[in-house]
Every structure is written in structure tokens, then in C-alpha cells.
Amino acid sequence: MKISIIGGGAWGSTLAQLLTDNNHQILINEINLEYVNKINNGIHPIFNQILKDVKATVSLSETLEFSDFIVLCLPTRVMRLTLRKINKIISQPKYFINVSKGMEIENYKIIYQIVQEEITIQNIKNYACVMGPSHAEDVILRKLTLLVAASLDFSFACKVQKIFYNYNYLRVYSSNDLYGVEICSAFKNVLALISGVLDSFDFGYNFQAGFISRGLLEMAKVVDFFKGDKQTVFGLTGLGDLIVTAFNENSRNYQAGKKIGLGMEIKDIIKNSSQSIEGINNLKAFYNLSLEKKIDLPIVKEAYQMIFNYKSIKIILNNLLKRPLKLEKIF
């Protein structure tokens, strides 16, 4: 099968190798010419591992003509604009598979909703996402990984499941909870960012565990708002992805949070990062969502005040600890 990947960074190039291992033909579209040259010379652009039989081009039209399966692997901030370009180029319907984890700041749309708005319905054969605890640096080394393929059309989720499944190192589960999976995958970026901030202050494991538990509850509230399945929060794309992101030194969001806690300016963190840090924009998105839709997300709200309005950690913790005492109720 031929598969086109839009975005050849850390994750896009890694998935290209996985799909090539699965005997698919891959063409990556990447705007960074240096990345394109490295990929075409058989080298992963970020990790410098060997890539076999993976090709890349700067031409978006060439990539779209290559196959009917389009894998979206882009930062959320450029997703809408890129989809508009795609919609102008394609002349026949495509299958869209999203592997990007994020939410738009302005209108808190997940990637599925952005695709619906920017790609005319006649150009969409079907849509799925593939998410889960999956640091690219492990997958490129073919370390064991578990993911979830989700679609509103369960039969298509199962089709995508088989495309990505590799019996040697990557197992894929299927789901029809598309909204829940994409929300969890975006929200965990926020919790990982906050986890990094907390670690920089060395509050200890007790508080870290409490924060994660209550953070999952807030994740569930957002999933419920989007009419997703709250049980998804405790699966691979919720708790699973949170574990690998919130406590891992290789996590961009966790590292960004640590730097914020140590006093580094956000603009400098973004400037010095070669890869997208989705947690920063996702925090803004979920904060705005909580205000407009009146969703009670105390951790998100206080984290926003600390990170963007420079409130002291002492004030933030006092605000959280002085909330009215109540029954622990999960759902």
C-alpha cells in the first residue's frame, strides 16, 4: 500500500520507518530541505538513525498524488493552513489519518474538527487517528509500543489498526471513541507541562501522584463535554500517554515545564526547541474552553495563571489547597 505522510519531523519520519517495516511504500512531505535531504540519504532527521526505503519531497502536490492515504503529522498551529492547501490540490477523495496531538487555541477544535472544516466532504473518504504512549526515540529503535487507532467508523479504525500494527514491536488497539482519544491526547500535554513545573520545585512524589490523579479527573470532564467516553481517560491515550509524557526526561512538554519552573521565559523555550511543544498552546486552549463553557478545571486555571500571568507557585498552591473540602467522586 502507498501512504503519504505530511510532516517529516521526529514522529513523522519514525512512523515512516514503521510503515516501511510493514511493507508499505512511503513518501513524506516536509518543508525543511535539510530534513528532506537527510531522509533521502537514509538518515532520520532528528535521531540520526538509519531509515530504510523512505523517501521525502518538499512538493506537497507530489506527496498528495502519491497515495489515497494521508497521514497528518504536523504541529496544531499549522494544521488548518496546511489542510486548506491540501483541499485546493486534491482532485479525488482521500483517507485522512491524524497522528498529531493538539487543540487549536482560538476555538478549541481538535484535529478531526479542523479536517471537517477545511476539507470538503467530497474529498474525505474517511478519518481516523492513531494515538497513545509513543515517544519517537523509542519507536525508531523498534522498542515495544502500544497504540490506539480510533474512528467514528469502527470498520475504518480496524483497517488503520492493521496498517500500523507490527507483530515485532508495535501493537495497535481499535476504538470508536474518536473524540475521547483526541481530547485525551491533547490534554495530557497540559498535564505533562505542569508536571515538569512541579518537578522543578521538588514537591515530592506524594503531591505528584495527587496532581496526576486530579488531573485525570479534569481530563475526563473535558472528554465528557465533547461527548466522548470517559473510560478512554484510563486507557492508552489517557493514563498511558500521560505516564510516558509527564515523568519522562525525553518529553518536550515535561522539559518545557521544568524550564518554566526554573524561570526561563516561554518565548525562549519555544525559540530554543527544534520541535513543537504542544502543551503550551494546549494549556491556553483548555483554559479558554473552561472559561467559555464553564467547565470546572481548577488545575488548568491555576496553571495558566502561574505560567502566563506569572503568579507565584505559593499563591497557586494556596488557591488549590483552600478549595472547599468535598467527597472524592470520580464520575
Swiss-Prot record:
InterPro entries: 6-PGluconate_DH-like_C_sf, 6PGD_dom2, G3P_DH_NAD-dep, G3P_DH_NAD-dep_C, G3P_DH_NAD-dep_N, NAD(P)-bd_dom_sf
Pfam families, per database record: NAD_Gly3P_dh_C, NAD_Gly3P_dh_N
MF (Gene Ontology): glycerol-3-phosphate dehydrogenase [NAD(P)+] activity; NAD binding
Keyword NADP set for record: yes
Reaction catalysed by this enzyme: sn-glycerol 3-phosphate + NAD(+) = dihydroxyacetone phosphate + NADH + H(+); sn-glycerol 3-phosphate + NADP(+) = dihydroxyacetone phosphate + NADPH + H(+)
Chain sites annotated for binding sn-glycerol 3-phosphate: K101, G132, S134, K188, D241, S251, R252, N253
Role: Catalyzes the reduction of the glycolytic intermediate dihydroxyacetone phosphate (DHAP) to sn-glycerol 3-phosphate (G3P), the key precursor for phospholipid synthesis.
Name of the molecule in the record: Glycerol-3-phosphate dehydrogenase [NAD(P)+]
Source organism (scientific name): Phytoplasma mali (strain AT)
Lineage start: Bacteria, Bacillati, Mycoplasmatota, Mollicutes, Acholeplasmatales
